[in-house]
Structures are given as structure tokens and as C-alpha cells.
Amino acid sequence: PTITNDGVSIAKEIELEDPYEKIGAELVKEVAKKTDDVAGDGTTTATVLAQALVREGLRNVAAGANPLGLKRGIEKAVEKVTETLLKSAKEVETKEQIAATAGISAGDQSIGDLIAEAMDKVGNEGVITVEESNTFGLQLELTEGMRFDKG
């Protein structure tokens, strides 16, 4: 069995019979996937927010609200939220800040420390690849230049 709290992993497993429910579930899956593609984190939050928007939107439409008016209101709210988030965002610059942020995201400070070390070695333009291993523990392997895997 797989144990996860990742929104994308959970969303991928949802299969519904009802065609209308299936469309809604696919919409939420797309929200989680886009969030993962763009941010790499926050998929559970995005999924919960999408579900709340759909629930409240349907409730308002059932109560007689204009669907286009709701859409315009949501778009204005998204603009304001985005603006506010960008104003409150802080640059993560130091190795310690990277380690703290990565540790929170990974749910494990030792992973955060390893990511910070990797970022320190490759710089902002470098590529970091995370792979599963048959061995126990964490390790950092640095490849300078280019690496081509067979295939």
C-alpha cells in the first residue's frame, strides 16, 4: 500500500462512475497537477480550495446567482489574492533559508539540509534530480558538465 498526503497522488486515485461527478473530479485533478507542475508543493491546499470554490459556486447558482457574475468575482478575487501573496513573498537566498524551506516542504529536516547542500553546489541555474535508491539513507552525488542516461 502507498501512504501519502500529497494532493496529486490522492487525486490520481479518484475514479467516479457518475459522468457529472467524474467531470468535477477531473477538474480538481487538473488543479492539483497544475499546482504540482508550477510550484511543486501545495497540491493539497489547491485541492481543498478548488473543492470549496465548486461547492460554494454551485450553492450560489442554485440560490439564483448569475454564473458569469460568480466567474467574474472569482477572477477578481484571484487577482487580489495573487497581488497580496506577491507582496508578502520573501526571497529565499541563504543556505539556511533554503534548508528550512526544503525541510518543511519535505517534512524532514535532513532532506532539507541535503537539498540546501545540493543547491549550494549547483547554483540557481543547476539541475537537481531526486531518485529512489535501493540503499538506506540519503546521499548526494554531484555530476559536473552533462550526463546522459542510456535510452
Swiss-Prot record:
One of its GO terms (biological process) is protein refolding. Gene3D superfamilies: GroEL-like equatorial domain, TCP-1-like chaperonin intermediate domain. It is an enzyme of class 5 (isomerase). It catalyses: ATP + H2O + a folded polypeptide = ADP + phosphate + an unfolded polypeptide. Keywords: ATP-binding, Chaperone, Cytoplasm, Isomerase, Nucleotide-binding, Stress response. GO terms for cellular component: cytoplasm. Its EC number is 5.6.1.7. It is found in: Cytoplasm. Forms a cylinder of 14 subunits composed of two heptameric rings stacked back-to-back. Interacts with the co-chaperonin GroES. This is Chaperonin GroEL. It comes from Mycolicibacterium fortuitum (Mycobacterium fortuitum).
